[in-house]
Amino acid sequence: MATLLSAQRAGWRDYLELTKPKVVVLMLITSLVGMFLATRAGVPWSVLLFGNLGIALCAGGAAAVNHVLDRRIDALMARTHKRPLAEGRVAPLPALLFALALALLGMALLLMFTNALTAWLTLASLLGYAVLYTGFLKRATPQNIVIGGLAGAAPPLLGWVAVSGHVSAEPLLLVLIIFAWTPPHFWALAIHRKEEYAKADIPMLPVTHGERYTKLHILLYTLILLAVTLLPYAIHMSGPLYLVCALALGLRFLQWAWVLYRGSRPHAAIGTFKYSIGYLFALFIALLVDHYLLLNL
């Protein structure tokens, strides 16, 4: 009866929240960039529209599964305690059915309007995030973000393959950029929310190894990220405009990581986290602008 009443109280905004729309939007930006970088011609409108819609639906389905599996953890954390399942506005079964419907519709669109490889890579990414990361790694190891980050790094590869139909070095390099970006991004948030993660018994790196150790690894990963972001220029995938942007954005990220490591600002952790979001958006936009600038030279 409680489950039924919960489902009756749920509105469309609750189900939209299950999909983590802000996260999906950032994923779609990287997917779009992957599509446009894959071709010197225009991207077919059907691939552009339905390919990204399919990727978004699958990502939303994975996010909904994350809400279901993390509902007890979410209820213990200030950042997440008002999520639909944590507050009981949506019951687990309707949320799972919603996730399944999104995933099936997304897969159908990808199979119809892109290609089978894109669909299966998207499915692998969905399962990697929803099952491997959320269901196991998140609760099992402080390296959860490092290992599980591969699933979240897939969108530019999915966009590229949706257009080209095959995997090549360039989209894998885009995946590598997001893969290297993920640890400093999430560990900065984990430092800011350390007590909440400890209360929820989630073995995030600041909880298991302390803040100083985590800050050092944020700094090291930011250095790795800076080096990785220079590779598109090194392999002639991008030009001088991207190089300048990558250096400027990366050095600013490194400055944030250094300030965090030195402990000279009280809110450096959340500042680093927020900067990392804008950083990734700006970096991929720079890749896109540089791509079309090179085509017109």
From Swiss-Prot:
Q: Name one GO cellular component term.
A: plasma membrane
Instruction: Enumerate the InterPro entries for this protein.
Output: Protohaem_IX_farnesylTrfase, UbiA_prenyltransferase, UbiA_prenylTrfase_CS, UbiA_sf
| Gene3D superfamilies given in the database record | UbiA prenyltransferase
Q: Name one GO molecular function term.
A: protoheme IX farnesyltransferase activity
Lipid bilayer topology = Multi-pass membrane protein
What pathway does the UniProt record associate with this protein? Porphyrin-containing compound metabolism; heme O biosynthesis; heme O from protoheme: step 1/1
Q: Which UniProt keywords apply?
A: Cell inner membrane, Cell membrane, Heme biosynthesis, Membrane, Transferase, Transmembrane, Transmembrane helix
- Pfam families for the chain: UbiA (PF01040)
Name of this protein: Protoheme IX farnesyltransferase 1
